[in-house]
Amino acid sequence: MYLKALEIQGFKSFPDKTVLNFGEDITAIVGPNGSGKSNVSDAIRWVMGEQSSKSLRGAKMEDVIFGGTEKRSQMGFAQVTLVLDNTEHIFPRMEESEVAVTRRYYRSGESEYYINKQSVRLRDVNELFMDTGMGREGYSIVGQGKIDEILSVKSADRREIFEEAAGISKFRHRKEETERKLLTTEDNLLRIGAVSYTHLRAH
C-alpha cells in the first residue's frame, strides 16, 4: 500500500483544486516557508478523520476552509480526497485496487464523508483506517514536536500508540463498544424488571 494521490480544494492555502500524485518510492515535498508544506500533511490527517482543530493548527474546524485574500473570496467548503493503493488488499473490507477517501466540510458545520464515492459515516472512515494502523490516533503522520510528545507520555498512553501502529487498536475499540452495549442492555433489563414487579404488586 502507498499513497497514490491527494486532491485538495478549498483547504487552508489551497483555494483551487490541486492534485498531488505520488509514486511508490520515497517522495519529498519541498518549498520555502509559507508555501503550504505543512498544510499538505494537515490535509492528510484531516481526511483520515482528525477532529481536533488544535492538531490541525487552528482555533476551530472552520479554519481549515480557505479564508480568502485581497484578491480571492473565501471558500464555502473544504474538500480533500486521499487515494491509496490497495492491490495487496491492506484494506480487507475493500475489493477494489484503489481506495479513495473524501471528506468535505462546510462553513455551516456540516460534514460529509465518502469511501470510493459512497456516502459513509465518520465511524466508517475510522474503522477503515483502524484495520491498517493508520488511524487518526496513529502515528503514520508525525508532525513537528510529536516525537518529544511520544517520549514524554505516560506508559498507558504509549501502549495505545503502539496498539494503533500495530493495527490492533480496533479490537480494543470494539471491545469497549460491546461492553457499553452490554451495560445498556443490563440497565434496560433492570428497568423492565422493576416495571414488572410494580405491575404485579398492583394486581
Where do the protein language model's features map onto the residues?
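Gly/Lys-enriched N-terminal cap/neck module of very large, oligomeric protein machines
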Residues: 2-201
